Amino acid sequence: MSQPDMNQLMQQAQQMQAQLQEAQREIAASTVKGEAGNGLVTISVAGSGEVTDMEIDPKIVDPEDIDTLKDLLLGAFKDANQKLQTLAEEKMGPLSQGMSGLGF
């Protein structure tokens, strides 16, 4: 089996790096929205992980039942984080598979 040309490997590595940077830019420019309680609580999270917005339906705000609100907020945060992780895997997954062709 012949060894790959070093120039070809370098070119492939540079292409992969450019694709990786583009995927990272796309993720950073994205916003995902997590929700809980069928949309009673929604949380928007930027690709950087920063929470950018939160919406709480007033009908669930009950001073006598703060635990339910806390549970819904936590659920919305978890949902948003899961969606952000899925987005990153979708953008980065094909790139990591391509690295196997470079001998990594």
Curated annotation (Swiss-Prot):
GO MF entry, a single one: DNA binding
InterPro entries, A to Z: YbaB-like_sf, YbaB/EbfC
Annotated compartments: Cytoplasm, Nucleoid
One cellular component (GO) term of this entry: cytosol
Major localisation: cytoplasm
Superkingdom of origin: Bacteria
Database matches in Pfam families: YbaB_DNA_bd
rRNA-binding in keyword set: no
SUPFAM superfamilies per the UniProt record, alphabetical: YbaB-like
Keywords from the named record: Cytoplasm, DNA-binding
Task of the protein: Binds to DNA and alters its conformation. May be involved in regulation of gene expression, nucleoid organization and DNA protection.
Record text on subunit structure and interactions: Homodimer.
Family: Belongs to the YbaB/EbfC family.
Entry protein name: Nucleoid-associated protein jk2011
Organism, as annotated: Corynebacterium jeikeium (strain K411)
